[in-house]
């Protein structure tokens, strides 16, 4: 668990899309999309964090990074956006416009992640990236308060200084994108029923455009590797397995695509086309020994115990007596102190190293 070493708040996941992208209806999970876009924005901005993903998740084609579609709507309490606007917001109405732009649906009453409602000077929104909804209380164009609340009762749980609302759509249908899609679809749609339906959904603002339209909206699609900042480090664990996993996933996708007239290639990269970026890279592979003598060896073992504390401490004693160094990462202060006291009582030598320079 990477979060145990660097803190859960610094670990983000870029999950695989679980919905069927070959369908002409839009069935994406707002939580899943927001999670993916939060990870992409962190990579694009060069944030200090670790993004964990799989080969299957990296196969999906994305909108060009320059479109900044992963950018969150950032709001601060006690800020008058009329006199102190941002690039996205200069008042109450802009917040509504920006939510719609990011894929949020005005449902009149909250219907879970990806929905919002606006009444009077109050906007209730359920961000896809948060496990709770927030209430934005405006007075004119001043955002007086941001409150976390219970949607069932409206009861306030706590006030927040700021909130980031991540998009719940991976592409945006702009007038320019519409024109580009019309041009690419017009002729083939004359003889293809599915493409005709895509063209209809493009023109109908009352329905969500399916992901199958995304390749037609942009001149060129990109992938996760194109979102990486120059300072990013890409870590590949067992590259051969990553490629095998991608091939297996593409075979399953090909079965889903059968009879839809939407090609796998239009929505996904090939296994050989996986893009890990042009930045610094670290690769971890298993080494098989075949009659080779090693100059030196560092043996790493797992404690390999579960449940009973006595088993844990007994195993620790045997490892220490055998000359091993055992590393514990205990972020929680009270748990760390309890562990120290137990080890001292059992006569097991310890050394504490804190994540503060010069402290030990």
Predicted regions and their residues:
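Conserved beta-alpha structural segments and adjacent helices that either
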Residues: 1-360
